[in-house]
Amino acid sequence: MISQTGEDRVFGLYAALRRLAALVAVLLLCRITLADVEKMLATLQRHGGAPSVFRDWRQLIEDSKPLGTQDKLRRVNEFFNRKIQFVDDIQVWGQTDYWATPIETLAKARGDCEDFTIAKYFTLLDAGMSNDEMRLIYVKARIGGPASSVTQAHMVLAFYSSPEAEPLILDNLITEIRPASRRSDLQPVFSFNSQGIWANPNASGVPSATGVGRLTRWQDLLKRAKAEGFEF
């Protein structure tokens, strides 16, 4: 019979081998460094996520890289709309407004509109899309049909094929990606990405000179994402 101490050692070795197998599997799928994988997996484990979730996400990124833009947008949008359950921050994080990194969202498998949008943005960047093509947009979303005057704060991701083009909207509420002209229920307030902020969300060109520092939650999110190994 194996002693309790012996059992602990066996289980410890088994757990270590599982972690090693997860690392190897992920590295075979992607081109990020071992150090970055370890950082991301550490965050995933800290929040109770399974390595298989991380592996599926990295597989999505690698499979999306050679695809055309429309297919890339569709696959990433569907992945998060399917994998993540909409839940308010207070239930997930015990805070009224917490912006989670993609790894934190994957670990919890739950999040609100900001978390969906942030995860899609970073995933598409990793899949080869440019910062110039994407903005996170704060909107007022109309609730209750075309005649309703009731709105609530919401966030979506917008893709621009060119600076002057009508954006396509990626939304956790509607899986179909639609042009902005078909989302009359959304009233843009302002837009931003890791390069800066546009006070007029429909404006093209150079973002506000004040930069991302105006959004303290976004600035904090970027720091945490960078610490986890994300590049932007």
Where do the model's predicted regions map?
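A structural boundary/capping signal
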Residues: 2-3, 31-232
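Bacterial N-terminal signal peptides that target proteins for export
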Residues: 4-21
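Mature extracytoplasmic/luminal segments of secretory-pathway proteins
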Residues: 8-11, 27, 110
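Short alpha-helical segments used as structural interaction elements across diverse proteins
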Residues: 15-16, 28, 117
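Bacterial N-terminal signal peptides
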Residues: 21-28
